[in-house]
């Protein structure tokens, strides 16, 4: 993988810098690197593809090195150089694709395609290494079973989960109390509701709690917490728990009280915030517990009192909500996030070439299903194919 990254980095720089009219002395360093690549790979043969609808391609290399000149690069020099560079770029792209579409239950961090295994040969170690990529650094660490670390922006760590629970219900759902939530990616949106507006709750206070486990530990997270849940602040028709009927959710918004957010690691509270909104920081955690209250207003104008009657029927739901977003964090495991398109690249290629479902990844690279069973095998394979996707993204931009 190191060699593949160094190849891609060298070829990307060469394509950008070797242009007509450039003074040779300004590009002599990258020309020498390209010549090092040519001398290392000339005489080699590779084969890529042969899985799903990915066609088999045979690669041979017999190129002359790029020359030197005391003058500016002319059109002929650039054209000859581009022919060589484009062939190597096409080869690197094919190796990346071949690697992305393969998986293995055992040692999934190691190269799975014959072409990438071949590039691990000592013969190619002469190629200039450039390991500045976060993915390459972490791939090397994971390959040696050492601790890795990824900086993530809006990490997709929460599997999709959209549901509700009722702590009080009637067959007609005309007097209900409970919570409704949507967890997905890096965001939790939770609302507590009560048809009676805490009329019969102790002290006219209704308690709510929402616990969200995660499949991996996050470190040094920046989190935002806001006292509203916009997705649950509008009327909605909601299926009953048995799916045989529907009921009308008709929220009237109140501000939540006594809000508490706890970040836990292995069941122990690491960071705790009370009645604090805006930007929060959490050191390390693998689950989040959110608790809050709905308090019946002690004083109401006639218009408000009409919304929350003292007896049935109860046409509305007093509702309090919260939105928690994980803005950034570090994680030892590879995840998709808002900054990088690698999940899309991987999924698109596997669909394009009709790659059969293998022993590791779910059909269609379903991210929710993948997270719900984020095994060590999946993590190894995901780190490898995301690394290949990061290399491919350099040369196809």
Curated annotation (Swiss-Prot):
Post-translational changes noted in the entry: The N-terminus is blocked.
Residues holding Zn(2+): 153
Family matches, as InterPro entries: Capsid_hemagglutn, Rotavirus_A/C_VP6, Virus_capsid_a-hlx_vir
Localization, UniProt: Virion
Residues engaged in binding Ca(2+): 266, 286
Top-level lineage group: Viruses
Keyword Zinc applies: yes
Disulfide bonds: none
Pfam family, one: Rota_Capsid_VP6
Gene Ontology CC annotations of this record: viral envelope; viral intermediate capsid
UniProt keywords, alphabetically: Calcium, Capsid protein, Intermediate capsid protein, Metal-binding, Ubl conjugation, Virion, Zinc
Coiled-coil features, chain-numbered ranges: none
Further comment: The VP6 trimer contains a zinc ion located at the center of the molecule. The zinc ion is not essential for either trimerization or transcription activity of the DLP. Zinc-depleted VP6 has an increased sensitivity to proteases.
Family assignment from sequence similarity: Belongs to the rotavirus VP6 family.
Function: Intermediate capsid protein that self assembles to form an icosahedral capsid with a T=13 symmetry, which consists of 230 trimers of VP6, with channels at each of its five-fold vertices. This capsid constitutes the middle concentric layer of the viral mature particle. The innermost VP2 capsid and the intermediate VP6 capsid remain intact following cell entry to protect the dsRNA from degradation and to prevent unfavorable antiviral responses in the host cell during all the replication cycle of the virus.
Protein's UniProt name: Intermediate capsid protein VP6
Species lineage: Viruses, Riboviria, Orthornavirae, Duplornaviricota, Resentoviricetes
